[in-house]
């Protein structure tokens, strides 16, 4: 049996549809709510069929232990098949769940959600260190090698740093641009609603998703990305338009990093879990890993490019003249075994694309100077992606000792963005870094996601035996910076879509930046006789241009271009053919009910788009030029 135990502010459910194996229930069981409860998500497995009574006994014992720890007398039993791929028969599952309900009811207020029904549910996790626990129950007789009943933690590769993160004591403050540190409770956040949401999100540590954020519908409607049911949760499929947007973002970040002085490298996706150096680093990185077996070796899938780049640094001959030394990799993919309840759309994934740059510095002084430069670099990268300073909140995290020695550095970070920022300070260093920042995007559901980040690492040069030759010919350890100039590429797309959704609510017209728009110009001929001239216009434009040659009304064609967020829509009719000009609807300058239309020449439109996309990478149209030749992906 698998148990996922969530200490909840509340849990509520409502049945929607029964499956072929649904138990018969009374009307009272079709919905339920329990507050201040321990929610036990339960998957009864095939091994439990050998001794159901023993499985009940051991599961009840585990639930009681946790209930005592979190001090609650309310328990919700919730059948949740997704916890296991080796389920028991429905008959045994119902038997065990009812047995657990009966055993617990004498000492607790218990509710049980019905088995075999599709249900809508909402759970609010309290977010303290004991609020999310998993247990794996194996009754006697379940395996030949077992002589007695054993209760164990569910097998999962969890780093020591991640465990420490759950118990680390944080001091939360608001840092204002004037350099003052304020207690969170006493600071008026009313003028800063997004910062207020971010503070609440960070301090509560509640990451569970109650409903899909707006970008999920948008990524599907725009045919960018979708869930892939044939893969693990958090692994997405990208349609041609989505692949184009991803590719452009990847190329842009790599271009910026190489101009900044980074060398692009490529490293393996998997590493040996028992490699002594890597094992130590795993325990200092707050993440859950995918693990696999290969030729009797226990391997893990990388969650960043650190492993490969640091092993490469170890083998290099480096002079002080080479410092600062920068390397970058666009990791397609990095993998993190994020908890299932946190996965949603492009916001939090298990497989993602991360630009990961590392900088070897001569000493802490050089590291601090590089940190300043990379902070500004990250602001510039997001600005050019279309995510501005007012679109995200800044978090700065450090040890108290580092802050006392580097106050000016920290204060200048708040001055640069010219707004209050959230500070997290630790008395003890739990991780490999002494300072880090993130730019956090707060979405329409008040959930935050980190984008750009830079960290000062004081451990890994020693751990990986990385050294350089100083001016005196002696070996020295460098100080290391970790930098992701944009954050995960998928999160950039998520942030752009969420931003557009929020702007729509404000009465604005949503759109992607022109350089990222899959179709930059759509030409809409009014009738078949205008198609030839439409083709002539298309040839004069050096950008991603398509032609809507379908046999539809002009109104429908224009509306569909709007639903696809096409930045420039060109309508071709008799007047345009006679005057050799084009009627252009400019999306960026339009209102929701007031399209901005301008008469111009193809050459003028070409010059306008060239100026808007200057300095950005370009790729050709990802689909057929003529809409009549395109398949539908959704």
From Swiss-Prot:
Cofactor note: Binds 1 zinc ion per subunit.
Gene Ontology cellular-component annotations: cytoplasm
Protein name as it appears in the record: Threonine--tRNA ligase
Subunit organization: Homodimer.
InterPro entries: aa-tRNA-synt_IIb, aa-tRNA-synth_II, aa-tRNA-synth_II/BPL/LPL, Anticodon-bd, Anticodon-bd_dom_sf, DTD-like_sf, Thr-tRNA-ligase_IIa, Threonyl-tRNA_syn_edit_dom_arc
Keywords, comma-separated and alphabetical: Aminoacyl-tRNA synthetase, ATP-binding, Cytoplasm, Ligase, Metal-binding, Nucleotide-binding, Protein biosynthesis, RNA-binding, tRNA-binding, Zinc
Species this chain originates from: Methanosarcina mazei (strain ATCC BAA-159 / DSM 3647 / Goe1 / Go1 / JCM 11833 / OCM 88) (Methanosarcina frisia)
Region of interest: Editing domain: 1-142
